Amino acid sequence: MAATLRIQSDWSQALRRDEGEAWLSCRSPGKPTLYGSLTRRGLSTEGVPDIAASEGFVVGEVTKKSILISCPHENVSTKFLAPYTTFSRIHQKSITCLDISSGGGLGVSTSTDGTMKIWQAANGEIRRLLEGHVYDVNCCRFFPSGLVVLSGGMDAQLKIWSAEDASCVVTFKGHKGGILDTAIVDRGRNVLSCSRDGTARLWDCGKSSCLAVIADCGSPINGIAVGTADDSVNLGTPEKAPSEREIGTEGKILLLAREDKKLQGVGLQSRQPVFLFDGSDAFNCCTFLSSTYFLAGTQDGNIYQLDVRNTNAPIQIIHRSGAPVLSLLPYRDGFIASQGDGTCFIVQQDLDYVIDLTEADCDPVYKVAPWEKQIYTCCRDGVVRRYQLGDL
């Protein structure tokens, strides 16, 4: 695995001061870590800090919110990005999940303070409080319309809410344990959930009923993802004709990130197993990059890239630290990942550097939600951070 560059979490504040300093490190497996520092020498005429790096590190482009650092000896470069803005008043405690609406106007988040809130994405102003789950809410997401929210709680209930008036319009009951993740099929006539009870279920929103148990694997399912599978993949055939209430399940595959170190693929309409992949540790999350490629992240810091047509061996394993991989999602021609040590990074195929979203100081970044060139993250420190990406 390639070398990893790290920077002091509050580097942008530290380098605002005259002669301010921030530490750097370059860690390469099997070699001693190279430590260094950045020092501010002054300001350029455009008001951008003039930054010098210690031996072994090179400073590239600097803006008010970003700095490109390379370590030529290890042939590695990282662009560190500071938040454009932070919202610390949405919740009082750790924020466990968030999502941004399709139009970019609203955010929804859940917290260990026991609340789920809808807020304005531009300024963090709270618009609605979604009340009705017993115990903590684990996951929340907007439907594609951006007007409706799906949530899952430790109370084993799945709920659908109106973002406009905060009313709970549907409650799904059937799981025997806390709900850990959800997914939406197409436009949202059907939704999916997975639970500590070891099952993944398909639900009919219109009739608020369970259409099927898609998988029952005897191990908690930590994360799910649904995607259209490549035509060459045999998804199996249903044992009985699908209900007419089932909409958009054909040709889809459901990924299950399991606690028992297994990643499973199931034909969504057929309910038939497609593959079973053994990982190094519990799988926490998974996502599709395309109809052929998908990613899955483990508790010991591995990100597996797999090809749905042949899951015998991974295409690659990305490992930047031993911290749990908590969130994965596709972004442009690459992906965004967040980990339990506060790191959050973006990998793009055509970029020769990694983009590192900084400021969380060793607190897990639980979830990431992109909207166009803005990336929102939520963290154990109770802060929602919004990053502004330049032209990639």
Swiss-Prot record:
PROSITE patterns documented for this protein: WD_REPEATS_1, WD_REPEATS_2, WD_REPEATS_REGION
Pfam family, one: WD40
Parts of the chain that traverse the membrane: none
Disulfide pairings: none
SMART domains (alphabetical): WD40
Entry-linked SUPFAM superfamilies: WD40 repeat-like
WD repeat boundaries on the chain: 90-129, 132-171, 174-213, 278-316, 359-392
GO CC terms of this entry: proteasome complex
Keywords from the named record: Proteasome, Repeat, WD repeat
PANTHER family listed in its UniProt record: 26S PROTEASOME REGULATORY SUBUNIT RPN14 (PTHR19857:SF19), MITOCHONDRIAL DIVISION PROTEIN 1-RELATED (PTHR19857)
Family: Belongs to the WD repeat PAAF1/RPN14 family.
Function per UniProt: Inhibits proteasome 26S assembly and activity by impairing the association of the 19S regulatory complex with the 20S core.
Subunit organization: Interacts with proteasome 26S subunit ATPases.
The protein, known as: Proteasomal ATPase-associated factor 1
Organism of derivation: Gallus gallus
Gene symbol of the encoding locus: PAAF1
